[in-house]
Amino acid sequence: MAELNPLAEELSCSVCLELFKEPVTTPCGHNFCMSCLDETWVVQGPPYRCPQCRKVYQVRPQLQKNTVMCAVVEQFLQAEQARTPVDDWTPPARFSASSAATQVACDHCLTEIAVKTCLVCMASFCQEHLRPHFDSPAFQDHPLQSPIRDLLRRKCTQHNRLRELFCPEHGECICHICLVEHKTCSPTTLSQASADLEYKLRNKLTIMHSHINGATKALEDVRSKQQCVQDSMKRKMEQLRQEYMEMKAVIDAAETSSLRKLKEEEKRVYGKFDTIYQVLVKKKSEMQKLKAEVELIMDKGDEFEFLEKAAKLQGESTKPVYIPKIDLDHDLIMGIYQGAADLKSELKHSIKKLQKKSEEHNGSGNKGDQTQSTFKPVQPSKKTIQEKKTKKTPVAPGPPSHFSPNKLPTFGAPGQSLDSKATSPDAAPKASAAQPDSVGVKAKVLENFLTKSRTELLEYFVKVIFDYNTAHNKVSLSNKYTTASVSDGLQHYRSHPQRFTYCSQVLGLHCYKNGIHYWEVELQKNNFCGVGICYGSMERQGPESRLGRNPNSWCVEWFNNKISAWHNNVEKTLPSTKATRVGVLLNCDHGFVIFFAVTEKVHLMYKFKVDFTEALYPAFWVFSAGTTLSICSK
């Protein structure tokens, strides 16, 4: 099992790289074989150092056998022996000297093949010339080995003696005279050293083979996970595509329903006009027939016949044509249009919110490395509408608008607070209600906005439309409720508690509680008109309902050739300007509203610094005939 391999590394001595044999623990917390650490410190001498972390000990620590580590090593060895091998692979055996050796010539006759090498005579002999080593007592103590090709390699270059020992500490073969220089080492015979190293290498091969198998399985696992990710994302993309298809279907159904209602309204009004037309045609035909009969009688010369027919026609009377007042149901049309506008606003807001979350997610690091991640289809409307419900002001009339994939909003209620637009990076962050910005920060933010270009201001652009429920009866609204002017006659709007009754004013449909918002108004024949903002609680009746003449409204006003800024019935005369477009920047978070004169560039007209306490509405005043205020599109 591959999971045992990391444990084998943890249970290996860092000196001999083998499993612990009688493990001991140093005061610094590292484990070694007792023999390995003892030999290391004997060679090293004081001061003593830990072979792993190199911590210095002036006095050699007393080492005790780590019984817990011994038990762990024993359990590991038992698990290694008991576990079923992954495969039947075993390390290849090392070839013996006899099988590995090639044919060596006899050093005596140089023709026959040697059968033995004498390590004392330092020569190889064939069977014939080897006989003295068996027959003569003088050669009986000479050690014989299988034929060795290069005997010179076995000789010590320093002492010219045969190297018959191996020093594991220095990793080299030595002769008996070299032992003087290796007093602290633990030399062994070549056969013993060869057997030990062969055992270690066989273990190393086993571990390497296991590691290679582990790497192979890891590669397969990575490929498998890669395929799982690909399959999972394919499914998720298909689900996402299905969600968007359903949303498109909902929008298509809403469009079809809205167009059908408009068609029905058109058919209703058109049918009434058609009926009236048929009645008028019939009435006209009757009047033309009567006219022809009268003209015919007038041509009669016979008085008796004239009197007889004239008396009969005298009883037939005609009445002037009357056309009953027939008009489209503007409330219905406005409701349908506002429903579509609300739907578009909800979608834009949800998409921006989703993009913002995605940017924040990418900025904080990629957390999607897990193969099995939670996937939730995008359904932006529910949370957004819930926010809109909580942001509705108490003075705002009308029902709240709802949006869901299955139901189209029927009408955007006046007073719905629009969520603030995302600000640009150079703008100051939002101020919380619990911790208002300091005066210095507010002043810095205000100064920052006073130096912005029109292009930068348009980053905060919001679409404003007039709320016909607030329009005075002398104010005429047109162009999809984006143009206001003074009408010649009363508009006969239906009664509404939010409607202005004293001043010819109108408010924007939506209010703003937080964030930064910018809109522009085009003035045609800019005389006797005003542009500003107000609380929803501003009076609707009496002189105090006039824009700027109360503590709940702020405006810039054109009166004849004079331009003034008004608030709480206090007037501030402003320099005249030829600009016909006014830009209004409202910063709810930092408490100020700025009025700009917009030409090719923007120029400051006036600014109010206020700690706003309620939701704010765009507000407009028109008084002079011919004066028109038009909300500009971006």
UniProtKB/Swiss-Prot annotation:
The modification Phosphothreonine is found at residue 90. The modification N6-acetyllysine is found at residues 272, 572. Its EC number is 6.3.2.n3, 2.3.2.27. Residues 353-437 are annotated as: Disordered. GO terms for molecular function: ligase activity; RIG-I binding; transcription coactivator activity; ubiquitin protein ligase activity; zinc ion binding. Auto-ISGylated. PROSITE patterns: B302_SPRY (PS50188), ZF_RING_1 (PS00518), ZF_RING_2 (PS50089). CDD domains: Bbox1_TRIM25-like_C-IV, Bbox2_TRIM25_C-IV, RING-HC_TRIM25_C-IV, SPRY_PRY_TRIM25. The modification Phosphoserine is found at residue 99. There is a cross-link at residue 116 (Glycyl lysine isopeptide (Lys-Gly) (interchain with G-Cter in ISG15)). It catalyses: S-ubiquitinyl-[E2 ubiquitin-conjugating enzyme]-L-cysteine + [acceptor protein]-L-lysine = [E2 ubiquitin-conjugating enzyme]-L-cysteine + N(6)-ubiquitinyl-[acceptor protein]-L-lysine; ATP + [ISG15] + [protein]-lysine = AMP + diphosphate + [protein]-N-ISGyllysine. Residues 215-305 form a coiled coil. Ubiquitous. Residues 363-376 have a biased composition (Polar residues). Pathway: Protein modification; protein ubiquitination. GO terms for cellular component: cytoplasm; cytoplasmic stress granule; cytosol; nuclear body; nucleus. GO terms for biological process: antiviral innate immune response; cellular response to leukemia inhibitory factor; cytoplasmic pattern recognition receptor signaling pathway; ERAD pathway; host-mediated suppression of symbiont invasion; innate immune response; positive regulation of canonical NF-kappaB signal transduction; protein K48-linked ubiquitination. It comes from the Eukaryota. InterPro entries: B30.2/SPRY (IPR001870), B30.2/SPRY_sf (IPR043136), Butyrophylin_SPRY (IPR003879), ConA-like_dom_sf (IPR013320), E3_ubiq-ligase_TRIM/RNF (IPR051051), PRY (IPR006574), SPRY_dom (IPR003877), TRIM25_SPRY_PRY (IPR042753). Forms homodimers. Interacts (via SPRY domain) with RIGI (via CARD domain). Interacts with ZFHX3. Interacts with NLRP12; this interaction reduces the E3 ubiquitin ligase TRIM25-mediated 'Lys-63'-linked RIGI activation. Interacts with the KHDC3L/FILIA-OOEP/FLOPED scaffold complex and BLM at DNA replication forks. Interacts with RTN3; this interaction prevents RIGI ubiquitination. Interacts with YWHAE. The RING-type zinc finger is important for ISG15 E3 ligase activity and autoISGylation. AutoISGylation negatively regulates ISG15 E3 ligase activity. Functions as a ubiquitin E3 ligase and as an ISG15 E3 ligase. Involved in innate immune defense against viruses by mediating ubiquitination of RIGI and IFIH1. Mediates 'Lys-63'-linked polyubiquitination of the RIGI N-terminal CARD-like region and may play a role in signal transduction that leads to the production of interferons in response to viral infection. Mediates 'Lys-63'-linked polyubiquitination of IFIH1. Promotes ISGylation of 14-3-3 sigma (SFN), an adapter protein implicated in the regulation of a large spectrum signaling pathway. Mediates estrogen action in various target organs. This is E3 ubiquitin/ISG15 ligase TRIM25. It comes from Mus musculus. The gene is Trim25.
